[in-house]
């Protein structure tokens, strides 16, 4: 087993019993692959598949003019290079996007020619707007902020059958219905009403009898009956009526007359029910015709039109009921045979026939007109309009599209074998659906479960973007059609025809403000990755919160391995927003799949199959925890399995598949909770959600007890920096790592250098701090994929959301009542939970009517201390410590001219005083923020002179870029010179620098004596070597040229003006870093849904301590465990203590200077006594020493979900660490020194500080803004508002009879405008009298009554 560079520095001991068959797939694959398929950017235009952008273009083009004389064809499209990279876009507030150009061909036909001939063809590239690009971490940068497009779970197109569960009609009768849902186009519903008539409706409009639709699509009543019924035949003569008998149709009926055999024996007596036995006897007796009485025929329904053979007159129509009169008429016309439809009350209802009776339309045209009137009420139905509308509804590909998925689902449901076909509806499709619906009503078949994941599919980014792009193109198509007719006469080019604005508007609208385009949750790496793996049932075309019932939100058996049953928000969105399970992926149709191991003849193989929910139902699937022997055979005779969405037991020979891993059913966040199997699901849900709110601490600390997935999450989220290629570290500082790549990994023409510029103190979307730290030293050899730098909340390449705290479960004088948390002062002193938050404050200088606002350091009425922080340009220095109210950027705005008195004019003229014309509108630090300025950015509009500060920022950036290029060049040259040295030594020269003699052999000493750049001047006798030398020289010259061009490009980008909103001349952004220490009121939590608020920070000496004097860090309430049933936290605490104890033992061994052999033996005991074995022997002595050094503060454990450490293993580890097997110890009270009565559970728990900090919530108003109409103070921290004194609070004061307090509350402290000012004046004068007046809200009430035309006045006494 090989370990990566960072893994071998700290190996996590895993308790997993089952070896992993399938590595966890790349966690952002869904997003990245979906968008790559949409763009197809790295494919040649002619190799692109018809999906994504290509499909959108092909579905709209070619566009023909109305006269068919001009046509616009699509050839291909090209995506240009984005003008700015991701970082530049974030700084400048731009969208990271690529220009899209489509090549189109305009063909104009010759009108005059007799047969169609082409007059001219023009081809041209047309700009189609910008398409946002995805960053390599699966997000988008839109207007400078990172956003995520969440995948949507929607109802799959196809056909669905359901019933109303007896809720519509009072009798509780089940009313069946069917619905054909296309990908785009009109919905078609079929439904039964309580009287068993069958109706249809289009797009939920008013219903019409189903036979109207069948007639409209071209069926006659005769054909309709033929399609849905089987017939009984009768032979009529003057004397008798013979009935062609099919005995099985009579079963269950009552005989209306004696049924006799040919010999005259009675088989069934009159009024007896015909049973299966009777039917068998009739078949044996060979009865095929029966003479029946007349009333047996009466009341039956004709299945065809009856025509008089002689006259051609229609005697009776299909679906007519046979009466005595009609029967006489038929006998008179000598009709010999008639067919009636076969129905019975049990399983052959006459629904279609009855519906045909209530249908008043006569023929196809009348039916189509009826449908037209329903769709377009009030419009006159002309024949063309009626035909066009009807064809457009279900038959025109541009208006109606079932999609490939819809056709596949449709064919599967109606029982066809082939899964592809046209994506519009056909007559056969409609007949097939009605047939199944009638069968359902007849009691045969099953309805569909719409919450089954086989009936819901995922639309990912690519598909959502494609739909938006297509909708933009449809708008373009309309405009192009209009203009094409002009193109014929006016000699227009393709770019004159196409206006790309609708396309770019649609795309911008989607990425900027769609419900599914969300501001990325960037609190920590886990919240990023979870946001990108989220699946939402909301959004356009999805559900709404209000309408979604319980069933949709509930966990469904098909969620197994596809959607996490645990992670979902609490509140109104519960169950509507889900998270993809760890191994889940989507198939080509958009249905979720999960992997299983193939089982053949009871032997579990390593062959992996991905199954969708539809396929899974038909197999017998064993759980991941089924016991296997060494060969991979099931050891038990009966194994717990899943089959047809039910849990059952099966013998090994029946099993066809087996789960891949125990963690397969949960999502990333849930799989990070150790001992998840011991937690109640509700608490696990809170735990998953709270991990996403953990604020990155100053120093990340790996969890002592993890689940082994931490490394995968840290690397896949993109926060930890991964080596792109293997090599040797050449240079490291805090902000960049330079790697000299191995020769074998460098392709021809590539630069053999990788430079990793690290992100330093950058603000995330949630104002947390993103900071990367290098993990490598100069000279380290790294391989591709190794972690070279840690990001926020990662520790040596592992996710580290919180800190490991020594916790004790015990009460402490009521300070941990109701989930409060008591913490030690030591935590605060050691900055364990200190976090850095970065606030972005910006100011713009605009061009106003009265003149331009000016950013300047020259501001009147500012103290020296305030001005001292600003530079000459009026912008704060980096590194300045600022408090609330301090000036960050000085800015003055021109004031309107006021009328001056002659005296003032005179003074002005003498002193030239102009300063009073401006008012101070500087950017100040808002209340509640104090910190250090860490960065300043200045943006200037094109054509406006830059100030010194802006210039200096640009120069620094260029210097940094130059350094990168110089490093690359240095390494490239060094590599080249090594190659040249190898080439030259030992070769014969014909001349060269330092008067090199002809025929001399080149030596290392000679080469070292001259500047390597002069080696190119050496002339060689060997022709081949000379050519090689020239090639290397040329290669270096090209590289230099490329680097110079790159530098110039960067310089041009930086020196060109910035794009700013209209009217804005300059924008300054100041970044302030705020340090937040832990304090009472902050919310903290464990990973098991155990959350609480800090109630008190206690001095270290008062905390409970162990016998050796170690004080605990956190005291938690033991009552928080039993009722919440999250026992996982207790097991984590025990195992965490063992981890720490083992680390201390290793530390003692190191300090005692023990031999490496002893260390190896002890490590072997830890790693290889139980759980997954680790290959300690493969590490060198140096690596073992390094590993032991890193394990001193605790041996990290992994206890994977559903496959974790057992109670026995935890006890063994405690014993190995020399700790009590019970995990409990007697503590002493820090205040008195006395021992507590009972042993207390003590250990290490990974505790998180959540992003609900008291600093962000605390706020106090003295005087602030008032609401305009009511003149009452505003509410909320953002508005600097007051506390609401509501109705109930008024009752409280009334109850106490405190009249004056009440009066003060409702008047001068609220909306008595005059009273407020008077109170202020009297307080200033030292007089504490209150004179309350009229509250403004009363005036508002008076005004409202007047608005109702009632004159109301106040009478003053």
Swiss-Prot record:
Gene3D superfamilies: 2.40.50.100, 2.40.50.150, 3.90.1100.10, DNA-directed RNA polymerase, beta subunit, external 1 domain, DNA-directed RNA polymerase, subunit 2, domain 6, RNA polymerase alpha subunit dimerisation domain, RNA polymerase Rpb2, domain 2. PANTHER family: DNA-DIRECTED RNA POLYMERASE I SUBUNIT 2. The gene is rpoB. Keywords: DNA-directed RNA polymerase, Nucleotidyltransferase, Transcription, Transferase. PROSITE patterns: RNA_POL_BETA. It catalyses: RNA(n) + a ribonucleoside 5'-triphosphate = RNA(n+1) + diphosphate. One of its GO terms (molecular function) is DNA-directed RNA polymerase activity. DNA-dependent RNA polymerase catalyzes the transcription of DNA into RNA using the four ribonucleoside triphosphates as substrates. SUPFAM superfamilies: beta and beta-prime subunits of DNA dependent RNA-polymerase. This is DNA-directed RNA polymerase subunit beta. The keyword Transferase applies. Belongs to the RNA polymerase beta chain family. It is an enzyme of class 2 (transferase). GO terms for cellular component: DNA-directed RNA polymerase complex. Transmembrane segments: none annotated. InterPro entries: DNA-dir_RNA_pol_bsu_ext_1_sf, DNA-dir_RNA_pol_bsu_external_1, DNA-dir_RNA_pol_su2, DNA-dir_RNAP_su2_dom, DNA-dir_RNAP_su2_hyb_sf, RNA_pol_bsu_bac, RNA_pol_bsu_CS, RNA_pol_bsu_protrusion. The RNAP catalytic core consists of 2 alpha, 1 beta, 1 beta' and 1 omega subunit. When a sigma factor is associated with the core the holoenzyme is formed, which can initiate transcription.
